[in-house]
């Protein structure tokens, strides 16, 4: 089928897409390849239109093309580099389609009309001493029938719990990664690009089929916690009840803000994430969704860049060890602006967790060190005190088990902390004894108190 599309060079300064009234601008980085380009997929019939990139579209390693004559909502796209295709790392939305009997991920064009974006700014931030945080997995938080939510496991479901969180005294939620993950493998393109011979195609097909025939199929494990290489700009579609995850995510943030609850995101970067990508991701969520802060995890090579970025100086930043001296150095090129502040930074470490657990279960020679840490207030920056985290025992586990029992998750006991400083109150695991249950409840209240 022929489509009335026209392609012309465009000039942009960053990767990604910009949606126009009658088309879009596509930009992507390609290094050292024999051929590259854009593949457009017409969503109603999944017919493809391939746009090869020539030097006319290139500015350095950034290739940009302006496509006119398309309706953004009707098209998906992928890029190709030599023999492979891949989704756009800067896509705002991903969708799954089936083509030729195979599942394929397409990047979507999302118009982001002005009325779908929040006004720039965010709610008034609290002092660190006033913040009470709750770490949340969006899907798991309302997945149970006991959540009484009509939108279980979604952004809307979490928004429905805003009043519940407020009544608990929670005034900040830290969300585990909420963006799409990159597909684990690159897909073979349909119809090879010019320059690939028929014999090369046949050899590739033969080798691929031989490997598949001799490799036993392993059941795929769900990446439940959503840590991995991300499409950082695309809120996760499976966390949305609607077909517009961006709008649902934005409305969730607005609802939490209206209830006085700040929203912090965990950003997990792999080694493939550049400093530029990490900085742009943080700026994107602040300007587009009014996010109040970030907990950087994984490869935080952009830590110093993000922490000292003037645009993010009012945005909370959690990490395990900040280079405070380097961050507070005077700007030699512009000394009149003064030294940068670090009051938006907050230290995340397990020292308090370990001491609190040992103190509550009455370990010897821990009282003095616990009291010292309990009353110490960091100068100029924040510090999070917590007794449980998703990387180890839950609060109920902490008073029910002396040893971890991760037997059913396929990891053979390799995951989780080896030493949880826990105490089972006399019985390993669940117990029906009233005195054991009462002791465990008392211990949990003690933990909540400290």
Q: Which residue ranges define each predicted feature?
A:
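Catalytic domains of carbohydrate-active enzymes, especially glycoside hydrolases
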Residues: 160-178, 288
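Structural beta-strand segments of beta-rich domains
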Residues: 24-27
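The feature marks proteins involved in alpha-glucan
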Residues: 1-22, 50, 57-135, 142-150
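Active-site neighborhood of glycoside hydrolase catalytic domains
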Residues: 247-330
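Conserved alpha/beta catalytic core and glycan-binding cleft of carbohydrate-active enzymes
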Residues: 290, 303-450
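Hydrophobic faces of well-ordered beta-strands that scaffold small-molecule active sites
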Residues: 132-134, 173-175, 263-265, 294, ...
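Short proline/glycine-enriched turn/loop motifs at strand-loop junctions of beta-rich domains
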Residues: 30-36
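Aromatic- and acidic-residue-enriched carbohydrate-binding clefts of CAZyme catalytic domains
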Residues: 147-154, 185-258, 269-288, 405-429
């Amino acid at each position: 089928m022929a489509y009335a599309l026209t392609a012309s060079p465009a000039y942009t300064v960053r990767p990604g897409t910009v949606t126009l009234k009658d088309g879009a601008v596509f930009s992507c980085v390609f290094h050292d390849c024999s051929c590259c380009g854009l593949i457009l997929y017409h969503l109603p019939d999944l017919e493809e239109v391939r746009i090869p990139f020539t030097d006319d579209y290139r500015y350095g390693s950034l290739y940009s093309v302006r496509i006119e004559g398309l309706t953004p909502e009707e098209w998906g796209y992928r890029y190709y580099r030599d023999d492979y295709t891949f989704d756009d790392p800067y896509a705002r939305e991903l969708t799954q389609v089936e083509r030729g009997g195979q599942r394929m991920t397409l990047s979507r064009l999302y118009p982001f009309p002005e009325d779908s974006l929040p006004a720039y700014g965010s709610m008034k931030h609290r002092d660190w001493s006033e913040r009470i945080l709750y770490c949340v997995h969006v899907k798991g938080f309302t997945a149970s029938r006991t959540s009484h939510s009509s939108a279980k496991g979604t952004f809307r479901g979490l928004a429905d719990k805003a009043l519940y969180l407020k009544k608990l005294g929670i005034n900040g939620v830290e969300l585990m990664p909420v963006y799409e993950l990159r597909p684990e493998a690159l897909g073979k393109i349909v119809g090879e690009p010019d320059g690939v011979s028929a014999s090369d195609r046949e050899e590739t097909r033969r080798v691929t089929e031989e490997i598949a025939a001799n490799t036993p199929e392993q059941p795929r494990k769900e990446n439940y916690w959503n840590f991995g290489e991300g499409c950082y700009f695309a809120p996760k579609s499976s966390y949305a009840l609607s077909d517009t995850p961006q709008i649902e995510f934005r409305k969730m943030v607005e609802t939490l803000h209206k209830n006085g609850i700040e929203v912090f995101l965990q950003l997990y970067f792999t080694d493939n994430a550049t400093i530029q990508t990490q900085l742009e991701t943080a700026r994107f969520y602040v300007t587009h969704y009014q996010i109040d802060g970030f907990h950087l995890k994984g490869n935080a090579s952009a830590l110093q860049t993000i922490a000292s970025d003037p645009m993010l100086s009012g945005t909370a930043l959690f990490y395990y060890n900040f280079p405070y001296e380097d961050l507070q150095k005077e700007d030699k090129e512009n000394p009149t602006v003064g030294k940068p502040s670090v009051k938006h930074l907050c230290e995340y470490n397990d020292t308090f967790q370990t001491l609190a657990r040992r103190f509550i279960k009455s370990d010897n020679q821990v009282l003095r060190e616990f009291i010292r840490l309990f009353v110490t207030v960091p100068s100029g920056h924040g510090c999070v005190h917590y007794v449980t985290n998703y990387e180890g025992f839950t609060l109920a586990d902490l008073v029910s088990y002396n040893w971890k029992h991760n037997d059913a998750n396929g990891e053979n006991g390799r995951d989780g902390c080896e030493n949880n400083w826990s105490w089972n109150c006399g019985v390993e695991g669940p117990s029906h004894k009233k005195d054991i249950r009462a002791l465990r409840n008392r211990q949990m209240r003690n933990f909540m108190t400290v």
